């Protein structure tokens, strides 16, 4: 019987047939030392694993991912194109690098001279806010990669006002809109593309996935993630130095990761100084003989210091009682679990960092064991950082491939890296689920080896 991966439809929507010769001079010939065009019949499979004795296939354009890159024929006449760029959601290292790459490729490779920066996220397309449009030229974006944040500004929310947003796109007479944003922003991009199709407009919507949590499905790595690991590792190094310099010192570092613990996991492996890493995907007990606090006590007794790294979404089940108030916090206070979601559609979380800080302090006080705990939350220092060189390279390539896709009339898609190849991915497939750390996979196993923590910190009932 054929061994098939779970069925997904990776077909990419197009505005029509590409008939215009590309202004980029490339080749189809191997061995002539000229970069080659990419054909629309070049694909890769999202599933690499196979089992002996089982056949793989059949393959179609639906279960294969379309290769990204410049085509020989394009859909839009570059001299007629008006392109827009918008950044949505929170800050992330590399935003300006992506903007710069898009502008330079449009202007320098395709000859597109009308490029508009939409200010402050989706709200920049809404008439209520009346934000100015920022004309983008090579001179404007030349040095923007040297600073963090977003040249265009950003905001959360507004993406649910799809009709108003498409009205704004029409008012600006945009032919292409590049949407740089995370899961919530790309869900908005999907709705925008659907409304554009409903109106029978020839406007390309191209997403560039932005999430420092690295939780976009199918995408191997999100831009800014490598920079986040660099900065997070620096925070852990500081926590370790504080901990080992004190009597029974404990360093507690809270990192980003609402539903996926990739930053915490990679940081634990990279730092070589983390003794416990806690992520949303792996539940743990606080109390009891096999709980976190008992194991932390053993670590302090043995080595006289400890470092804990916790993702912001970890341990949420420990903080909520039947009344919706975090356990150990009868007054509610800063740990209270807020109902509903934020402007980006994310579920509001209780603060696991402050919760653990309090619980650790109470536990050792009751045990009459002196500790010196230092708590570090570097989240906004990480988000606003300038992209590391490895991320700058990635952002440049993401931006270039996004432009190539848009000029060919591709739409309702994002650019992603899969198996080290840039591909086109349909937005509706990407946003249907989030990527998580597999508790039974090799990454988490390696993290456990790096920290030396127990494989399971749950009490057997």
From Swiss-Prot:
Cell compartment(s), UniProt: Cytoplasm
Catalytic-site annotation from UniProt: 213
Ranges in a coiled coil: none
Catalysed conversion reaction: beta-D-fructose 6-phosphate + ATP = beta-D-fructose 1,6-bisphosphate + ADP + H(+)
Residues binding ATP, per UniProt: 90, 156-157, 182-185
EC number: 2.7.1.11
Family in the record: Belongs to the phosphofructokinase type A (PFKA) family. PPi-dependent PFK group II subfamily. Atypical ATP-dependent clade 'X' sub-subfamily.
Protein name (database record): ATP-dependent 6-phosphofructokinase
Record organism: Treponema pallidum (strain Nichols)
């Amino acid at each position: 019987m054929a061994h098939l991966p779970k069925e997904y439809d990776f077909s990419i929507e197009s505005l029509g047939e590409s008939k215009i010769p590309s202004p980029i001079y490339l080749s189809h010939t191997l061995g002539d030392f000229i970069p080659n065009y990419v054909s629309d019949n070049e694909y890769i499979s999202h599933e690499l694993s196979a089992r002996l004795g089982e056949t793989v296939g059949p393959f179609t354009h639906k279960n294969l991912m379309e290769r990204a890159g410049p085509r020989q024929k394009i859909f839009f006449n570059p001299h007629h194109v008006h392109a827009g760029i918008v950044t949505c959601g929170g800050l992330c290292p590399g935003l300006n690098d992506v903007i710069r790459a898009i502008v330079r490729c449009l202007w320098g490779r395709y000859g597109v001279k009308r490029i508009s920066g939409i200010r402050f996220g989706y709200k920049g397309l809404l008439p209520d806010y009346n934000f100015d449009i920022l004309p983008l030229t090579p001179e404007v974006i030349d040095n923007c990669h040297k600073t963090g944040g977003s040249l265009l500004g950003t905001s959360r929310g507004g993406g649910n006002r799809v009709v108003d947003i498409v009205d704004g796109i029409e008012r600006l007479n945009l032919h292409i809109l590049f949407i740089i944003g995370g899961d919530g922003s790309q869900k908005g991009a999907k709705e925008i593309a659907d409304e554009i199709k409903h109106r029978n407009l020839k406007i390309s919507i191209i997403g560039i996935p932005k999430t420092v949590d690295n939780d976009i499905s199918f995408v191997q790595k999100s831009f800014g993630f490598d920079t986040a690991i660099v900065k997070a590792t620096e925070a852990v190094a500081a926590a370790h130095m504080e901990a080992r310099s004190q009597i029974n010192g404990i360093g507690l570092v809270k990192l980003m990761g609402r539903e996926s613990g990739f930053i915490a996991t990679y940081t634990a492996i990279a730092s070589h100084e983390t003794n416990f890493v806690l992520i949303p995907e792996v539940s743990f007990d606080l109390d009891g003989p096999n709980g976190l606090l008992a194991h932390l006590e053993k670590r302090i007794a043995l080595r006289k210091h400890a470092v804990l790294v916790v993702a912001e979404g970890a341990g949420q089940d420990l903080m909520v009682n039947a009344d919706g108030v975090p356990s150990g916090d009868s007054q509610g206070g800063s740990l209270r679990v807020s109902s509903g979601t934020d402007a980006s559609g994310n579920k509001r979380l209780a603060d696991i960092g402050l919760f653990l800080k309090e619980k650790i302090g109470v536990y050792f006080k009751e045990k009459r064991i002196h500790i010196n705990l230092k708590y570090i939350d570097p989240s906004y220092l990480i988000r606003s950082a300038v992209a590391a060189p490895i991320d700058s390279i990635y952002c440049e390539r993401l931006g270039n491939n996004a432009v190539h896709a848009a000029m060919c009339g591709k739409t309702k898609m994002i650019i992603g890296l899969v198996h080290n190849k840039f591909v086109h991915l349909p937005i509706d497939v990407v946003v249907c689920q989030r990527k998580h750390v597999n508790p039974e996979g090799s990454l988490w196993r390696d993290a456990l080896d790096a920290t030396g923590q127990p494989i399971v910190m749950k009490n057997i009932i």
